[in-house]
Amino acid sequence: MERLTRLNHFLVNMRWDFYEGVIQAGYIRNLQRELDHTPAELLGSKLDLIFFRESLNLSTYVNNWYMQNLGVPGPVNFIEKYHDACFSNYMKLMEIPSPLDQFEIVPLIPMHIGNFYFSFTNSSLFMLLTLSFFLLLIHFVTKKGGGNLVPNAWQSLVELLYDFVLNLVKEQIGGLSGNVKQMFFPCILVTFLFLLFCNLQGMIPYSFTVTSHFLITLALSFSIFIGITIVGFQRHGLHFFSFLLPAGVPLPLAPFLVLLELISYCFRALSLGIRLFANMMAGHSLVKILSGFAWTMLCMNDIFYFIGALGPLFIVLALTGLELGVAILQAYVFTILICIYLNDAINLH
């Protein structure tokens, strides 16, 4: 009865009392050795892990005790409930960070105006930093006396980006003279540079990836798309609607095709924003997951953990390089699609 009382005491209070008569001293020493070899920054998590692991082993100890002392299996329903409670407590204690935490918008300077809530957030901060960086870069390179006869690295970078976007505009937008094309060039150049620097800035540790938020990319794509539509109406008037009905379409199919083309046209803006948002968010999440996994294994004082971490570590390095390429590619894809849509609005293709 004394041992049964001790078991009940443990079950009620979720203490280690029952283990005193079950677990040998050598096992306790092994646990202590495991803790001694744990880095200080991981000690809290390690304690939680040991508690969780030993709590799950409770069913084995309880069943063995019941079979040896009472001749019947342990209370299955209680053990299942206890497991659920242990797992719930473990998840709360561990506070396992989500790979999506890096995309959280945090208010830095909260502001209230009436019933409206405004705030200066980390997203606003990094957008301003991005704009400030490339505007200052262009200013110092293009100001009077700023350009060098033999260009330095920064001037070469600006000239390279300028020529790249200019050639893109000339190649993709047809039906206009060179001077008229120049009207659209500044907007397209600023859009490309903004997206490029936002994407690349998101690769810096502890920064914020502005283009990983759907509302930001959607606002950018819709505002540009509305501008493209206005250009189409300014150039063609109501005849702009003729692009909804391709030439030579049979009359019975006309209503269906007009509706289909209208939906397709409106979804251009949606797909433009979703493509950028999805690629940036998915890539950064994958890098976060694998880097966290590799770092955890590297922190374990075990040669097998260390060797096992080398694979994920190399994958993280490869994915980081891939993400740099994706950051540049997505800015290019967004820009070239703007040029294509603008060409369609001008030439009714």
Curated annotation (Swiss-Prot):
PROSITE patterns noted in UniProt: ATPASE_A
Q: Which residues form the propeptide?
A: 1-97
- Cellular-component GO terms for this entry: mitochondrial inner membrane; proton-transporting ATP synthase complex
**GO MF entries:** proton transmembrane transporter activity
Q: Which key words are in the record?
A: ATP synthesis, CF(0), Hydrogen ion transport, Ion transport, Membrane, Mitochondrion, Mitochondrion inner membrane, Transmembrane, Transmembrane helix, Transport
- List residues traversing the bilayer: 118-138, 184-204, 213-233, 240-260, 280-300, 303-323, 326-346
Entry-linked CDD domains: ATP-synt_Fo_a_6 (cd00310)
**Similarity field:** Belongs to the ATPase A chain family.
Q: How does it assemble?
A: F-type ATPases have 2 components, CF(1) - the catalytic core - and CF(0) - the membrane proton channel. CF(1) has five subunits: alpha(3), beta(3), gamma(1), delta(1), epsilon(1). CF(0) has three main subunits: a, b and c.
- Other remarks on record? The atp6 gene is located on the border of one of the mitochondrial DNA repeats resulting in two identical copies of the mature protein with different propeptide extensions.
Task: Indicate what this protein is called per its UniProt record.
Answer: ATP synthase subunit a-2
Q: Which organism is it from?
A: Arabidopsis thaliana (Mouse-ear cress)
